[in-house]
Amino acid sequence: MAVQQNRKTRSKRGMRRSHDALSASALSVEANTGETHLRHHVSPDGYYRGRRVIAPKHGDETEE
C-alpha cells in the first residue's frame, strides 16, 4: 500500500475538500400546472415546457 512521505496540513486538506460541497438541486415550476420538477425533466403529470408530452399511466386525470 502507498504511504505518504510528508503529513498534509489542515490547510491543504481543507483546500482539497473545498470543491466537495454539494449544492441543492435546481427546481422548476411548470407553467400550466404549477407543479415542481427537476430542470430538463418531465413533471410527474406529464408536462414539459407547457406541453403534455406523456399521458399519465393512471387514467384518472382528464385530458385538457
Curated annotation (Swiss-Prot):
Keywords: Ribonucleoprotein, Ribosomal protein. Pfam families: Ribosomal_L32p. The keyword Cell membrane does not apply. Residues 7-16 have a biased composition (Basic residues). InterPro entries: Ribosomal_bL32, Ribosomal_bL32_bact, Ribosomal_zn-bd. GO terms for molecular function: structural constituent of ribosome. GO terms for cellular component: large ribosomal subunit. The keyword Glycoprotein does not apply. Residues 1-64 are annotated as: Disordered. GO terms for biological process: translation. Belongs to the bacterial ribosomal protein bL32 family. This is Large ribosomal subunit protein bL32.
